[in-house]
Amino acid sequence: METTIFQFQKTFFTKPPKERVFVLHGEEQYLIRTFLSKLKEKYGENYTVLWGDEISEEEFYTALSETSIFGGSKEKAVVIYNFGDFLKKLGRKKKEKERLIKVLRNVKSNYVFIVYDAKLQKQELSSEPLKSVASFGGIVVANRLSKERIKQLVLKKFKEKGINVENDALEYLLQLTGYNLMELKLEVEKLIDYASEKKILTLDEVKRVAFSVSENVNVFEFVDLLLLKDYEKALKVLDSLISFGIHPLQIMKILSSYALKLYTLKRLEEKGEDLNKAMESVGIKNNFLKMKFKSYLKANSKEDLKNLILSLQRIDAFSKLYFQDTVQLLRDFLTSRLEREVVKNTSHGG
């Protein structure tokens, strides 16, 4: 049975369904994320996230079976991302798919949400194991909203905060973001903060404050800001990246790679090696990248880079061994760096 995300969300929190396993898919990912955010608020520490591309078969089954074993006293919500990658690990063996279906069918005391980052086609929904999930669970779709509906949602958000936005300013904001709800959420929050006192937004103000995140923000901008020690902006960009569904481990992977290369370059420099040749030896051959890395080397001492590598290793260990939230660990790391810079600048200024 397929239902819309609006219908599902309305009933789930007032009259929880008997079904226990659901597939969430659709074009409006913001609506799915909004539901999952409310789900996390409801379940707190009993809200668990699994990444299909990271977890092994046995870890996956253990996680689901544990929710059944220990779920007697406290109901849990298990959210599974990158489910397609997990299915690839199972291969084409019929028995493995049957085992997976059996495990999902036997979830009785908790809720499992299989989340896709796009709208699934009929052919995909009619293939196993999703076909079986539809029979004993549910399919929830977040269809694309009309432009008028999106406009009304944005207007409602401003009105809730008592802010009057000029019509041409609103139209500009909608065009700038391409009516993308994920981008609009970020920009509306920013504009609400900006207009919190005077309670009005003009076209010029929206042009000055808002920008289209998806066109301007990427992982490399985050890495650039961090390595140049602009931690305040790095924090904002990190939140934007996560909001757009960038996996935190992808961010960690690129940042760790840069940190290791920079540390290696510092050591080679100390030994008297030519910097350009040293860069090429670690795979940096593009002139633009060379220029970037030179600015990073100037901004960071060898000790800075060593500490950065150790911090990233700690974040990696805590997230994998103790299942701590990688994003929160990154935020804490950036916040501590920012506080340290503020103290340093204050002491120098005094």
From Swiss-Prot:
GO terms for molecular function: DNA binding; DNA-directed DNA polymerase activity. It is an enzyme of class 2 (transferase). Pfam families: DNA_pol3_delta_C. Gene3D superfamilies: 1.10.8.60, 1.20.272.10, P-loop containing nucleotide triphosphate hydrolases (3.40.50.300). InterPro entries: DNA_pol3_clamp-load_cplx_C, DNA_pol3_delta-like_C, DNA_polIII_delta, P-loop_NTPase. The keyword Protein biosynthesis does not apply. GO terms for cellular component: DNA polymerase III complex. Keywords: DNA replication, DNA-directed DNA polymerase, Nucleotidyltransferase, Transferase. GO terms for biological process: DNA-templated DNA replication. Component of the DNA clamp loading complex consisting of tau(3):delta(1):delta'(1). The DNA polymerase III holoenzyme complex contains at least 10 different subunits organized into 3 functionally essential subassemblies: the Pol III core, the beta sliding clamp processivity factor and the clamp-loading complex. The Pol III core (subunits alpha, epsilon and theta) contains the polymerase and the 3'-5' exonuclease proofreading activities. The polymerase is tethered to the template via the dimeric beta sliding clamp processivity factor. Belongs to the DNA polymerase HolA subunit family. Part of the beta sliding clamp loading complex, which hydrolyzes ATP to load the beta clamp onto primed DNA to form the DNA replication pre-initiation complex. DNA polymerase III is a complex, multichain enzyme responsible for most of the replicative synthesis in bacteria. This DNA polymerase also exhibits 3'-5' exonuclease activity. The delta subunit is the wrench that will open the beta subunit dimer. This is Probable DNA polymerase III subunit delta. It comes from Aquifex aeolicus (strain VF5). The lineage of its organism: Bacteria, Pseudomonadati, Aquificota, Aquificia, Aquificales. The gene is holA.
